[in-house]
Every structure is written in structure tokens, then in C-alpha cells.
Amino acid sequence: MENIRESEIKHSAIRVATLLCVFALVAVAADQNVVVLLWPNGAPGSEGKTALEKVRITPDGEHVITSVYQPSITVYLPSREMATGAAVVIAPGGGHAELWVDHEGYAVAKWLSEHGVAGFVLKYRLAREAGSTYTIEGNSLPDMQRAIRLVRSRAAEWGVDPQRVGVMGFSAGGDIAARAATQFDAGDSAAADPVDRLSSKPAFQALIYPGLPPDLPVSRDEPPAFLLCGADDRAGISEGLPALFIQLKHAGVPAELHVYAGVGHGFGVRSANTGAIAGWPDQFLEWLSTIGFLKRK
């Protein structure tokens, strides 16, 4: 009897250990997010470039990405119960030479997904990285435009309303988001690739301490804008963003501007953020609600 009991105990222990392993694997899988290439067969302008992107980890544990040859989006979806149908393509900053994907990418997308908004972190090609042959207009902007189209093409799969796909950009990523909000098209109905038949116009734009291009055109055709920066940021941003707000207002584009006293550049979404700046994502969400983009359909 003792041997039988010992055997039963051993088998029970094995079953428990197996279940724990299964639960652990499920937890790991749930914590991993799908990465989707913008062009599965290779990005135009990156022919023959198959090297993997490089990842540098800072002393603070931040992940910084360089050498992006095949641009992609990392997908963060809300639960079905939370999903509002709204979606944001997020462009991290890094001076067009690198991508700070944590506090200006993954953390943002995760927060949004937990509040019912699908987040897609864009890894775009870098125009100012040492030795780069890419340009902002020729590669980085098309990466953003393709990402918008791609999200729309998989809207049903991802629980997204194709009419509520917007863009958000931080610093250099804000440059790209701002360009995407002014340079767009309805798609090419004759394109061989179904993705290219869809519109690249974002439904809204969120520019977070953006490095604005000096020649950015402003027109009444732009989508609604959420603008945000710190008062202590460099003049091109802390003065340039309010100037853009005035231009948008004169053009008849709905816009909201937030300038935070005593705040500089690069705050993003961090657990270390304190004071008023820690609540900026909530203000963005409130703005989305105000313009009617969080209403479930």
C-alpha cells in the first residue's frame, strides 16, 4: 500500500508540475505580441537587405533599436470586452537615427490596449543613422503610410474600425506622424497588392513633443489633432507646437493643445513620471472620446 501511495503521490506531483508548465507557457505566450512585417516579401528600397535589426539596452534597461531594413508593426490588442474599435499606429522617437521603443512605443501601446484602444508600434527605417541610404520622405513616411493601410486591411481580424485608425508620434516619430497627416491618398484601386488599395489618411493625429519639419503644410483636409509637449523643451518644439495649433485653428482643423510647465523632452509613458505629466495618456483618451472615436459600434 505504501508503494502504491508513493506512486500516486509521484504521479500527482508530475501532473501538477506539468500543469504549472502549461500555465507558464500560456502566460509567456500571452505576454508576447505579434510582429507583422509591413511588406512580407521585402520593403521597396530595401531589396537584398536581410540583416536583423540591432537592439541596444541602456543602463536604465531601455531597448533602443537600429538597423531597421524590414519595417514592421508590433500588435497590442485590447480584450474583446474592452475593445472600442479605435486604433493607433505609434512611431517612437530617436532623432531618425534610432528607435526608443519602450517608453515611446511598447509602454504606450500596452497602456492604450488596457483602455480599449488597439496599439501598433511601428519600427520604421532610419534616415539619419550612420551610413543610412534611406530618407524620411522616401522611406520613413512610406513605412507609416503602409502601416496605416495594413491595419485597415486586417481590421476585421484585429477588431478595429478602419475609419478610426490614427497615428501617434514621439519626437522624430512625431515628424513622421505629422507628415502622414498631411500627405496621404485614397489608395490605388488598380494596385496588385490589396493593402495598397486602401487609404493612408489617418483618422486622427497625436503629436507628442514632435520634431516638426520646417516646411510642414497645413490644410483643412487634415485629421483632428492632439498636440502635447513640455514648456521646457527646445524652442522648435515648445514654441513650434503652439504655432502649429494656431495654424490648424485657422485652417479649421479641430485641435487640442497641452503644454506642461516644468517639463522637458522625452517623457513618454514611464512609471517614473509624476505630477500632471503622468496623466497625459488619460487626457489623450478623453480627447478621443470627445471627438467620438471611443464609441463602440
Which residues make up each language-model segment?
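Short beta-strand element of the alpha/beta-hydrolase
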Residues: T84-G93
